[in-house]
């Protein structure tokens, strides 16, 4: 069933590109959403450009590709867009070559085109370090920023997360501490930030009015798109909750039961 939201009316005839969130839209955990493979094949046959979005800051793009290929999806590595990839594009656009990675080691793969400089970097990339993010590391990074004209690029700013059945600090508080101590504002890249959406659309060579966001998360996916003037559809899979339908502050343009409904909507436009 198709249900319209209250903000924009989508002109489906203008749509040339699709931003598909991965977790919750295409798959849930280690299982494809029912009918997702067939739906994506249909969308590709209609000649839509597709970018697969994820907010993960712990898994390099090649590993995500391996997972999607196991699902037998027709996809190449450059179809996948993550905060590290967005950060990489941002660095190139701003002619930044020397960086310090405050991320897990696996993410070095996504930054292999850059010089790792632990003395005088032009930018520090902050990702998820979990238990390795301690007082010593925070001080080390503080000194680098304090002593140099160094940008702080945060791949996300989540306040807390749940790991090993316990709630704990995520990247956001560490980023806030560095902002406060250095009097510098970090550049935030990742959903729902405008930087993330602007970079992926630019990478597709399309305008905002030519793309459509399909997501399950009312805040990161739908909110991020809507606040960037991008039309959005929410699926009733993944993180979708019934209370999303009565959220007075944020509504998608449409809701559908799952990605399976998407090809018919776009084809009938």
Regions found by a protein language model. Give the residues of each.
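Asp-based, Mg2+/Mn2+-dependent phosphohydrolase catalytic module
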Residues: 2-37, 42-46, 59-78, 85-269
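Conserved phosphate/oxyanion-binding catalytic-loop motifs
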Residues: 56
């Amino acid at each position: 069933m198709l249900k319209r939201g209250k903000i924009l009316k989508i002109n489906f005839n203008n749509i040339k590109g699709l931003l598909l969130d991965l977790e919750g839209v295409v798959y849930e955990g280690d299982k494809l959403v029912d009918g997702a493979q067939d739906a994506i094949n249909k969308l590709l046959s209609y000649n839509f450009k597709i970018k697969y979005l994820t907010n993960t800051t712990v898994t390099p793009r090649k590993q995500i590709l391996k997972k999607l290929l196991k699902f037998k999806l027709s996809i190449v590595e450059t179809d996948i867009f993550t905060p590290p990839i967005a950060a990489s594009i941002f660095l190139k656009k701003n002619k930044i070559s020397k960086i310090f990675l405050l991320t897990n080691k696996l993410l070095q793969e996504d930054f292999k085109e850059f010089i790792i400089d632990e003395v005088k970097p032009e930018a520090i990339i902050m990702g998820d370090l979990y238990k390795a993010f301690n007082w010593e590391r925070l001080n080390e990074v503080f000194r680098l920023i304090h002593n140099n004209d160094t940008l702080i690029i945060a791949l996300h700013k989540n306040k807390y997360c749940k790991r090993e059945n316990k709630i704990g600090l995520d990247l956001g508080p560490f980023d806030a501490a560095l902002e406060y101590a250095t009097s510098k504002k970090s550049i935030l890249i990742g959903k729902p930030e405008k930087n993330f959406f602007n970079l992926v659309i630019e990478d597709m060579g399309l305008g905002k009015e030519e793309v459509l966001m399909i997501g399950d998360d009312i805040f990161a996916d739908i909110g991020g798109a809507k606040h960037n003037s991008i039309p959005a559809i929410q699926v009733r899979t993944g993180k979708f909750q019934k209370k999303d339908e009565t959220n007075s502050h944020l509504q998608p343009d449409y809701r559908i039961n799952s990605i399976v409904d998407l090809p018919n909507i776009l084809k009938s436009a």
